Amino acid sequence: VGILSIKTPATTAPVTLSEAKAQLREVGTAEDTLITALITAATQEAEQIMQRAVMPQQWRWVMDAFDTDGDNRISIPTPARAVASVSYVRETDGTTVALTVTTDYLADVRSEFYALVFPAYGTSWPVPRAQPGAVEIVLDVGWADAASVPQIVKNWILMRVAALFENRAAWTSGEAIFRNQFVDRLLDRWTVATV
């Protein structure tokens, strides 16, 4: 079992300010700062719902040991474009050691829903120091660029931006703003199932 966290956040958005303004039928520039913030909020909400990154970024998977459930594979519950690094704290001297891809470990990132990391043929995982967070795997996650993000995910983000723009408060006249279930179901195809 590990802890997944953002190491390096995304620096670009999946939809442009122009695309969002077209969705809103907004032509002026007075609301540009707000709309840009809403794009960020909607993107982060999509990531939370789908349990996956939208734009390129790095996530860190931290474990106390090479937790493999007995089959030597480490299954990380998020899709990845690549495994950027695997490192551990050496048991004997407490030094952080970076493992080498193909020599020490291999990665399988073909799945849309998880990444696998396992020792290279003929090797086994080293024994890390018995301390919290002794093993760290850094993943390159998210679609490669905005053009690679599925259009349905972009459509959800644009619709969410429009809903947030129109309803700038969580409550109106004492009544909650209801979410459109159909719109939220658009993300189902890309949602990582959690157990």
Sequence positions of predicted segments:
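Divalent metal-cofactor coordination and adjacent catalytic microenvironments
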Residues: 1-195
